[in-house]
Amino acid sequence: MKRYGIIGGTFDPIHYGHLYIAYEAKKQLSLDKIIFMPAGNPPHKEGKKITSAKLRYEMVKSSIKDFSGFSISKYEIEKKGFSYTYETLEHFKNNDVELFFITGADCLMDIEKWESSDKILSLSNLVVFSRGGFSNKELIKQKEYIEKKYHVSIILLTLKRLEISSTDIRERIKNKERVDFFVPQPIIKLIEENNLYKEE
């Protein structure tokens, strides 16, 4: 059976933190493939300014081209209407594939607020990486609560802490600060060519 990891996000822009998480998940969980899933029309971002799906797709594609086992899917950006995680997992799930949904600690804390969270937990193995804002104690408590309630096993990734966020990168670009230590060079070129994030 193939083992596929799915890492979703707006990737606005993608940065080294995303690539590091994907690389470590692939290595630690012996995954055959990591599928990057740029969000199309995420319900939790409604009303917020988001870079076009086409450009976000190009940024991800340029970032992952030199990584073995990294791929990208257009499923969510080509889907009409809102993009719900459980629908994405249903699309990729089959008898020959075991899915690993890779997400941040904030998702674990709010998982029961997600659309059809029970389906997310039944269709995939939830793989969680730590993010600022939550203590280990809070994370473990929520992990044990969800595992007991839904009869699932949640995987916590062991990662070195990288404090990089797309929000911070956009703010730095707006303030004409350097971001080349956060973002791959081809992405900086795409950002500059398309005049992105000058006004947030």
From Swiss-Prot:
SUPFAM superfamilies tied to this protein: Nucleotidylyl transferase
GO process terms (BP): NAD biosynthetic process
InterPro entries: Cyt_trans-like (IPR004821), NadD/NMNAT (IPR005248), Rossmann-like_a/b/a_fold (IPR014729)
A Pfam entry, by short name: CTP_transf_like
GO MF annotation terms: ATP binding; nicotinate-nucleotide adenylyltransferase activity
Entry keyword annotation includes Nucleotide-binding: yes
Catalytic reactions on record: nicotinate beta-D-ribonucleotide + ATP + H(+) = deamido-NAD(+) + diphosphate
Presence of the UniProt keyword Nucleotidyltransferase in the record: yes
Pathway(s) it belongs to: Cofactor biosynthesis; NAD(+) biosynthesis; deamido-NAD(+) from nicotinate D-ribonucleotide: step 1/1
EC annotation from Swiss-Prot or TrEMBL: 2.7.7.18
CDD domains linked: NMNAT (cd02165)
Top-level taxonomic group: Bacteria
Enzyme class: transferase
Alphabetical keyword list: ATP-binding, NAD, Nucleotide-binding, Nucleotidyltransferase, Pyridine nucleotide biosynthesis, Transferase
Family: Belongs to the NadD family.
Function noted in UniProt: Catalyzes the reversible adenylation of nicotinate mononucleotide (NaMN) to nicotinic acid adenine dinucleotide (NaAD).
PANTHER family according to UniProt: NICOTINATE-NUCLEOTIDE ADENYLYLTRANSFERASE-RELATED, PHOSPHOPANTETHEINE ADENYLYLTRANSFERASE
Name of the featured protein: Probable nicotinate-nucleotide adenylyltransferase
Source organism of this protein record: Clostridium botulinum (strain Alaska E43 / Type E3)
Lineage: Bacteria, Bacillati, Bacillota, Clostridia, Eubacteriales
Name of the coding gene: nadD
